[in-house]
Amino acid sequence: MDLFEYQARDLFETHGVPVLKGIVASTPEAARKAAEEIGGLTVVKAQVKVGGRGKAGGVRVAPTSAQAFDAADAILGMDIKGHTVNQVMVAQGADIAEEYYFSILLDRANRSYLAMCSVEGGMEIEILAKEKPEALAKVEVDPLTGIDEDKAREIVTAAGFETEVAEKVIPVLIKIWQVYYEEEATLVEVNPLVLTDDGDVIALDGKITLDDNADFRHDNRGALAESAGGLDILELKAKKNDLNYVKLDGSVGIIGNGAGLVMSTLDIVAAAGERHGGQRPANFLDIGGGASAESMAAGLDVILGDSQVRSVFVNVFGGITACDVVAKGIVGALDVLGDQATKPLVVRLDGNNVVEGRRILAEYNHPLVTVVEGMDAAADHAAHLANLAQHGQFATAN
């Protein structure tokens, strides 16, 4: 589960990571009151789970409460990479002397954790890693010992911190590790971690991804998911139906069974999209290896509820999940949705009970559904239909 910035900030504060005051607001008037409460210079920041907020105009400095009102009024309702801004965080301003980068993530390949740190923070980490890879220190963290003072010192030394600053950064890194470990996260990122003019080290912006498999051990997970839109409507609907769903910024909805197949589907749709107007995957949705007709129907309900989706590619290889079960789920979902189903579906079935699955869909003969043999051909057709829809040409799947 990805958290909003304000939720990450609250967890940081709970674990003693130094942060500035921040208040979440869902209306311009609430933002104005928040700015008054904080006092002085504030920054109004869009709360969305994608990068690039600043470039999109989603982060604005507000010297007065009236300007905080205006900033929130401009930001709320904004679309940033397919994500609608429903909330802003009004944050206390800071006099920044230096910006750093720090993150901890799960390193599955090496069965350990990886700490990444740089004295050049503030920019997107992908850009830093590409343009100045030598500026990004990477230090393996033993899961059994974590980040203690010795490990934190190793990290700041590798990153090239000056001695005086390093002594201030070390205790903050240890606190950030406590957030990662105690909250059972798979990613904690602070960008930037700043040194203020007063000499304080503060986590100015944070990103946290929590391990959903650990939800049962944490009483606060339900509140994080639902409080103030902790998940958007589609994510919440997927979570309630035990579907693995991640919203992306494309136009071709993806449903598959098994994470490996879905990941491959994302790649092949992206490649097909290059031939059809730059269409890209709209999501990752895995209904699971033992999916039922109900989970298939729930998955379709989620995808068809995304306004960014122009076509849907259902890619299933029948194993434990038989193709006829998937077909029945598609039929059931379309029956329930009725006239609300307006987006073409391209279905590729293979494996267990594929003949019966194709027969069910052929007899159903829905104008929005096309069954295509072969993953390449199906992905190409789904991208083609999304491209047609983008240019205002209504098209059924057939």
Curated annotation (Swiss-Prot):
> Which reactions are catalysed by this chain?
succinate + ATP + CoA = succinyl-CoA + ADP + phosphate; GTP + succinate + CoA = succinyl-CoA + GDP + phosphate
Domain ATP-grasp, by residue range, is 9-237
State any GO CC term: succinate-CoA ligase complex
Task: Say which domain of life the source belongs to.
Answer: Bacteria
What does the entry's cofactor note say about binding and number? Binds 1 Mg(2+) ion per subunit.
User: Could you state a single Gene Ontology molecular function term?
Assistant: succinate-CoA ligase (ADP-forming) activity
Q: What does this protein do?
A: Succinyl-CoA synthetase functions in the citric acid cycle (TCA), coupling the hydrolysis of succinyl-CoA to the synthesis of either ATP or GTP and thus represents the only step of substrate-level phosphorylation in the TCA. The beta subunit provides nucleotide specificity of the enzyme and binds the substrate succinate, while the binding sites for coenzyme A and phosphate are found in the alpha subunit.
**Protein name as annotated:** Succinate--CoA ligase [ADP-forming] subunit beta
Tell me which species this is from.
Answer: Corynebacterium glutamicum (strain ATCC 13032 / DSM 20300 / JCM 1318 / BCRC 11384 / CCUG 27702 / LMG 3730 / NBRC 12168 / NCIMB 10025 / NRRL B-2784 / 534)
- What gene name does this entry carry? sucC
